[in-house]
Amino acid sequence: MTPRLVTIPYSHYCEKARWALERGGVTFAEEMHAPLFSWRGALGSGGGRTVPVLVTEDGVVKESTDILRWVDAHGRPPEPYFPPDRPEVESLVSMFDRRLGPATRRVGYFHALRGDPAYVEELLTADVPAWEARAVRILGSVLPRIIRSGLKIDEAGVARSSTAIEAVFATVNERLADGRKTLTGDSFTAADLTFASLAGPVVMPPTYATRFGGAHRLPAPLVAIVDGMRATRAGAFAMRIYETYR
């Protein structure tokens, strides 16, 4: 059975899982859905209401970090994502999953969904089933409002999330201050992959930015944020990790 990855195309948690599978040499089929419809694909595959979900012959893997663990067990990554001699990888991944991912999603989506309506429609319909794309177009501006409401994407939330992003980036800046190549030393681990992928909405490495039509298509306020975050040590690190390992 070919594993099947259920995703929202531009989700950074889905990008994390996609990256791990591809780097791990796992052949898989990706089933992409628009927001609001992704839960049907997730539940229909035996997962919960969120994506990514990986469907395998061994069962259903419901979280992005658990997908990395599955790749360690069943794939062929050049180096293990969770090496047994690097216990700090676990704590870093947990921090990025809990604190960074929700914050960058809120900030990135806040600005992306306020872009030109034609751009927003293109973002929400790219690579999804035709019937979902038609439904998105029928819903028009209603769907972005539903997304903003469901994820609590508002001015106050963005302010809190911006503070959270700055705190996580400061932690990463400090770890990198000694000149290390990766967050835990010399080898690439789940910590590096998780940080780089979940920083994606505010750093926009070219590989990830294609999901948004390319960095040149981003709304101006988001471009300003991306430029500022790329100028930090942590932001430059995320870009380098993408360039080297993606």
Describe these PLM feature segments.
Residues 46-50, 147-149, 174, 217-218:
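Short acidic (Asp/Glu) and glycine-rich catalytic loops that position anionic groups and cofactors
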Residues 1-133, 245:
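GST-like domain detector, emphasizing the conserved glutathione-binding G-site
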Residues 27-28, 35, 52, 140, ...:
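Hydrophobic/basic alpha-helical segments enriched in Actinobacteria
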Residues 64, 89-92, 101, 190-191, ...:
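Short runs of predominantly hydrophobic/aromatic residues within well-ordered alpha helices
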